[in-house]
């Protein structure tokens, strides 16, 4: 590309003349500006049309700092990586199910009966509400932690499993990097780059109570690559009747209402502006009818979700491996619902909006060091009159605003080749609780090749949800306890010792943790308000986690997770934290590729009995109740073949192979029996 | 045994030629009229010409350097005299022009890929007289490229190559180098863009690393994100052929900068006799190794630093010559 017209060349036959090229200085300024702008956007060729240009051209920076994942033995936190193969092999139907493979993660199928019939995914148990509000969840850096109750409504996320590249689960608090609500852990979902999902793919699934059709198109036009994924899913959820009820009363014979239809539309487009700059755009929609509720209690006559988001992410690769990134997104989660409750018919509409802007800069301030720093602002607006109508109010109208400002930094310093220090923290200011600082210090010592010890200490917070804040205002009103101190963030001080080792083809990840939780929030319980503290809860959690990944042969892979521990708590005001961490839980996945056609996997899960808080209405239990231990076995068998020259795959996936009937989280939440589905997939 | 003998002969031969060249250059009049013909005035081309001028000016020769640019070049600009003259054609367009309409003097082509030089020389019948139409290639010899793979990732010896269907000739000579270095070469061919990802995925199942090739049908800016991301996900590192590749996310690359080639050219010129009897087409003598430590760390690969890899490659190349 020539933007500068070449004038005549003045080259005197001087001895040893340095080439002097008289280029078009006479070009008009405007043309110069246009040329400059154009060349900025298309710094295409440094060289001309010659075939040597391939040696001279700039190449787009693809693996920039934010695209490169940190190896787990260098991370300041414990991380479990779930890759595409693991997701496939697990046979998971719902995104939330995948997390059963993460040591220490407690997953309860479709446990929430009130706001949305969604699974509870809680790291280290300690579940006091079904919306597992103590863990942050991000999709491509976009927080999907909902403002209303906290936590995540998994079926409301505009995402299709097959578009996920990998999931990084941070086991332990990480407010230093991800801010408040990264309290017990963080789930980081990373979708595939459109450049990796080119072509047309069609996938269909049929099974007991389940149907799904997915179509994906990935295209490319010059420096633009894009992907469009559309899907429709019908999910009947649990059986209507409980097969092995705990009580003869009707109430305990019926599962919750949890049928759902999910329409998904996702667009992701990545545009390479020039060799250093990329722009990523995402749009997602998730909508459709969703049932909620339980027999003889609150339930939806009609309920429909309408969610969408838009995101723009600009990245610039800097010299020396640095990066500047600016990300902006907007999310709307909308529910249209008519509910039936003891007051008759109620309007259960809700609108949750979020606007977020984040700037992040990565660079190397001195040799062997890397600094990531930046800041973000967020505005949440929550409208949920029915759900915020706490106490005697049936409705609380209004758009509740919430502002969040963050400033963060983390310095990674490789003091010696075998010694990596991470020092960082976050300063955060929000509408509800003011300013908090959450620091972290970690050191990773590569004792010898393939053996690393990690010691880290960090602090983290969880800020009150809009619902909790509304309760706070309610209790602090003149008619109740005007002297009640304002609610604060929940806090945790976390210390851990980790070991990451490699023994041939076996990867070992072991850690011991000691988490000191304080200021735990309880708002629904009148005793907490009467006692003068809505932040009275404390708990000490100690335990261990082990994760093994073994490539037994070229064709066989084994992944095992084990966790255990205990919680000590005074259970202030009767809020149960003790025993809320299962004494142990295991997961084991064995996958084997027989040949180019056949492959299969077997997955087993076992969770010890676990204590839960008061959401269960079992009359035989008072505050707190145990859910018995359970075992589950899943399996998958796949056959790959060519259909008209195109790659095709037929799979049969069986969840709960043993047809075990057991409860998760609540005694009116019986896991479906054996659920077999057939999946057909064709790359067109 | 026979090979070793031939290599020994070559070794001896090259020394004889070299010493002969040295003595000739001392005894006879050297080339002192140098014309540099640039394909264009882009930074790489001017870097070459200015570096060459600088190096020549530092030498003892009293050569004159004239720089021309192809777009403004007329054949009248060149001297009709072949003696004491050499023309350095920089880049493919300049080479093509000189192949099409040969000037009186010898032409040394630089910044041209090997297979392009061979193609053009053959096309215009200039391959018969390599001593008057020669080249210093832009690409690296196979033993150097494979040597880098070997030195960077010892023990990972399955190397994948992705090619377009018309570029098989790029691979000439690779098997021999691969055999010497005990590297297993896997090749996949992508016939069109829609075949790129399937071919790459097939390749990734049986490769420990990939080597990018100067094949513009595959390795162009629109495909590079797919290739780099897909291979990175499979934890298969990519070796590039320019510094830009390393910046983009390749694990390492060995390459010669225009300045390094200029240094080589200057040494060739200083060794020429007045009849400008050019040495045979050859690979660049000087090169650099770049590595991407962020990528190696992310893939948990332990890798030597650039300086020691360069040293290793130097000794490897010297041993092979």
Question: What are these regions, as identified by a protein language model?
Answer:
Chain A
Residues 95-98, 119-125, 137-139, 154-157, ...:
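N-terminal periplasmic accessory domains that precede
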Residues 414-421, 513-516, 534-616, 658, ...:
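Gram-negative outer-membrane beta-barrel transporters
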Residues 274, 363-370, 376, 395-516, ...:
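Structural signature of Gram-negative outer-membrane beta-barrels, strongest in the C-terminal barrel
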Residues 218, 270-272, 455, 579-684:
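Conserved C-terminal beta-signal and adjacent last beta-strands/turns
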Residues 142-171:
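Short acidic/polar hinge/loop motifs at secondary-structure boundaries
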Residues 175, 196-198, 218-303, 519:
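Periplasmic-side early beta-strands and strand-to-turn transitions of outer-membrane beta-barrels
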Residues 64, 71, 96, 100-142:
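Extracytoplasmic beta-strand/coil segments of soluble accessory domains associated
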Residues 224, 321-337, 382-383, 446, ...:
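Membrane-embedded beta-barrel scaffold of Gram-negative outer-membrane proteins
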């Amino acid at each position: 590309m020539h933007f500068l017209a070449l004038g005549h060349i003045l080259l005197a036959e001087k001895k040893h003349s340095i080439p002097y090229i008289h280029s078009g200085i006479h070009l008009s300024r405007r043309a110069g500006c246009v040329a400059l702008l154009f060349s900025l956007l298309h710094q295409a060729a440094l060289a001309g049309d010659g075939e040597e240009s391939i040696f001279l051209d700039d190449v787009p920076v693809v693996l920039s700092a934010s695209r490169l994942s940190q190896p787990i033995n260098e991370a300041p936190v414990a991380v479990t990586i779930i890759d595409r193969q693991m997701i496939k092999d697990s046979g998971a139907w719902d995104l939330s199910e995948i997390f059963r493979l993460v040591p220490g993660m407690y997953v309860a199928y479709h446990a929430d009966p009130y706001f949305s019939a969604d699974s509870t995914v809680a790291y280290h148990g300690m579940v006091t509400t079904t919306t597992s509000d103590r863990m942050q969840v991000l999709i491509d850096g976009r927080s999907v932690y909902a403002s209303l109750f906290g936590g995540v409504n998994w079926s409301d996320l505009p995402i299709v499993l097959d578009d996920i590249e990998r999931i990084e689960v941070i086991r332990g608090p990480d407010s230093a990097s991800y801010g408040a609500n990264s309290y017990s852990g963080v789930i980081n979902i990373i979708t595939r780059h459109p450049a990796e999902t080119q072509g047309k793919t069609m996938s269909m699934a049929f099974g007991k109570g389940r149907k799904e059709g997915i179509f994906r198109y990935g295209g490319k036009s010059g420096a633009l690559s894009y992907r469009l994924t559309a899907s429709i899913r019908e999910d009947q959820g649990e059986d209507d009747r409980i097969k092995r009820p705990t009580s003869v009363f009707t109430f305990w014979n019926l599962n919750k209402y949890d049928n759902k239809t999910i329409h998904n539309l996702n667009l992701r487009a990545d545009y390479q502006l020039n060799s250093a700059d990329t722009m990523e755009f995402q749009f997602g929609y998730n909508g459709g009818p969703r049932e909620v509720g339980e027999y003889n209690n609150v339930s939806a006559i009609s309920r429909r979700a309408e969610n969408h988001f838009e995101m723009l992410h600009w990245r610039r690769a800097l010299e020396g491996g640095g990066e500047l990134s600016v990300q902006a997104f907007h999310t709307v989660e909308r529910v249209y619902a008519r509910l039936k409750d003891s007051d008759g018919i109620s309007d259960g509409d809700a609108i949750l909006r979020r606007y977020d802007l984040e700037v992040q800069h990565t660079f190397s301030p001195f040799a062997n060091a890397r600094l990531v720093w930046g800041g973000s602002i967020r505005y949440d607006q929550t409208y949920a009159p029915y759900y915020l109508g706490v106490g005697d109010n049936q409705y609380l109208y209004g758009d509740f605003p919430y502002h969040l400002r963050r400033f963060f930094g983390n310095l990674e310093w490789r003091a010696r080749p075998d010694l990596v220090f991470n020092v960082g923290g976050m300063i955060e200011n929000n509408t509800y609780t003011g300013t908090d600082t959450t620091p972290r210090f970690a050191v990773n010592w590569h004792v010898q090749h393939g053996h690393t010890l990690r010691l880290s200490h960090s602090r983290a917070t969880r800020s009150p949800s809009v619902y909790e804040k509304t309760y706070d205002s309610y209790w602090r009103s003149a008619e109740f306890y005007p002297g009640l101190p304002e609610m604060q963030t929940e806090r945790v001080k976390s210390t851990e010792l980790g070991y990451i080792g490699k023994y041939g083809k076996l990867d070992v990840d072991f850690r011991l943790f000691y988490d000191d939780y304080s200021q735990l929030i309880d708002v629904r319980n009148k005793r907490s308000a009467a006692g003068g503290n809505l932040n009275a809860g404390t708990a000490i959690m100690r335990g261990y986690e082990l994760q093994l990944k073994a490539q037994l042969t070229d064709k066989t892979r084994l992944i095992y997770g084990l966790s255990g521990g205990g919680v000590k708590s005074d259970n202030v005001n009767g809020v149960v934290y003790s025993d809320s961490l299962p004494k142990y839980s295991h997961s084991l996945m064995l996958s084997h590729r027989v040949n180019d056609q056949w492959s299969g996997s077997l997955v087993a899960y076992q969770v010890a009995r676990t204590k839960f808080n008061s959401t269960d209405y079992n009359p035989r239990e008072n505050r707190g109740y145990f859910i018995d231990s359970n075992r589950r076995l899943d399996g998958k068998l796949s056959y790959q073949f060519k259909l008209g020259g195109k790659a095709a795959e037929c799979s049969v996936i069986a969840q709960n192979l043993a047809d075990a009937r057991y409860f998760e989280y609540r005694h009116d939440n019986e896991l479906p029996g054996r659920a077999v589905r057939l999946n057909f997939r064709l790359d067109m | 045994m026979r090979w070793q003998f031939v290599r020994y002969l070559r070794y001896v031969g090259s020394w004889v030629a070299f010493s002969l060249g040295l003595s000739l250059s001392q005894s006879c009049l050297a080339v002192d009229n140098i014309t540099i013909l640039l394909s264009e005035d882009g930074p790489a081309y001017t870097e070459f010409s200015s570096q060459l001028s600088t190096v020549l000016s530092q030498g003892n020769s009293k050569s004159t350097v004239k720089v021309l640019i192809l777009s403004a070049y007329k054949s009248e600009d060149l001297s009709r005299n072949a003696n004491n003259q050499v023309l350095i054609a920089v880049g493919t367009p300049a080479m093509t022009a000189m192949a099409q309409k040969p000037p009186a003097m010898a032409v040394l082509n630089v910044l041209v890929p090997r297979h392009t030089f061979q193609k053009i020389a053959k096309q215009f019948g200039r391959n018969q007289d390599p001593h008057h139409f020669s080249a210093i290639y832009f690409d690296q010899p196979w033993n150097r490229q494979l040597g880098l793979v070997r030195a960077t990732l010892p023990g990972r010896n399955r190397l994948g190559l992705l090619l377009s269907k018309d570029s098989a000739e790029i691979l000439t000579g690779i098997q021999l180098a691969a055999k010497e270095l005990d590297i297993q070469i896997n090749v996949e061919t992508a016939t069109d863009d829609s075949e790129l990802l399937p071919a790459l995925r097939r390749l990734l199942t049986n490769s420990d690393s990939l080597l990018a090739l100067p094949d513009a049908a595959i390795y162009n800016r629109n495909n590079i994100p797919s290739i780099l991301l897909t291979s990175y996900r499979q934890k298969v590192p990519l070796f590039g052929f320019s510094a830009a590749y390393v910046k983009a996310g390749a694990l390492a690359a060995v390459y010669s900068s225009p300045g390094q080639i200029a240094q080589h050219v200057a040494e060739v010129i200083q060794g020429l006799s007045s009849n400008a009897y050019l040495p045979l087409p050859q690979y660049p003598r000087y090169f650099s190794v770049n590595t991407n430590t962020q990528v190696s760390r992310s893939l948990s690969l332990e890798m030597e630093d650039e300086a020691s890899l360069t040293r290793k490659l130097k000794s490897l190349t010297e041993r092979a010559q």
